Amino acid sequence: MDPLSDVLSLLKPRAYVTGVLAAGPRWSLQLPVHEGTIKCYCVVKGDCWLSMEGVDEPARLRTGSCLLLPHGRPFVLASDLTLPPRDARELLATGERHNGVLSVSPGEDFLVLGSHFALEGDGRFLLDVLPPIVMLNNESQRESLRWAIERMLREMRDPQPGGALIAQQVAYTLLVEALRLHLADDLQRGTGWLFALADSRMRAALSCIHGEPARAWTLQELARSAGMSRTAFARGFKRTVGTSPMDYLTQWRMTLAAKRMQNTGETISSIAPALGYKSESAFSAAFKRQWGASPREHVRAHRSLLH
């Protein structure tokens, strides 16, 4: 698989909330903090404001606007930000639904399609390379998302057998497409493995690392895969990914290690050699540098969150 598919397969984003929200001319809605989630919204009709904690300026959303909110921060959607907001949790519990549409206030001056994705395990490998608000506003971007939006609207408004599963799968497709559009759009401005995928040379090297994480890769081998000299490759990788090739290899190995320990209960003695480490001590030291805790401490902390 390619690196983006690798990361998404590891995190297994699952759309646990997908729906359509409607509002009249005057409304305001407060959405709470949701750490470890990604929210995706597409404005089907009307305009509104988005104000997010930690972001200086509110964003104006218009018909056709699509956005990702990957950091789980609390935010307000509103026709007018001076209005007192309604709590989204209360709306979900008691709000009226008609033809699959949840109403914030009477009327349909505003319609937005939304999906909330839960990530399995630690999502920082993906979330840390994304800004608080990912805006997809230009016409070519909207066109590539249009079919998914229309299909999800159809499933929401006219529920059929199996419709919930279809909506969940289409929502996942929408998320992946939005990430692809973002990395292409922000190639010159973004730094991180996600943006590096838009550069064919860096993508080739990242694919080698993701394809064989246990291999004892050298800088020369990775540079050769990118068709570059060692010096130019090392400089280019650091500039686009934000870290050195060898540091990135370690980060990816430790991400895989954490996932395996959480999901399979494998021991360090079996995981370490499977990820290219000749000794448990070297593996444990690398793991602690990455996660700030020993492998055993990390697993205990993960289990405590599940209970």
Model-based region annotation:
Residues T173, E177-L183, A204-T255, R260, ...:
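Basic/polar phosphate-binding segments, predominantly the helix-turn-helix DNA-binding elements
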Residues W49, P58, A216, Y248, ...:
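Residue at a beta-strand N-cap/secondary-structure junction
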Residues L113-G123, V129-S207:
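An amphipathic alpha-helical interaction segment
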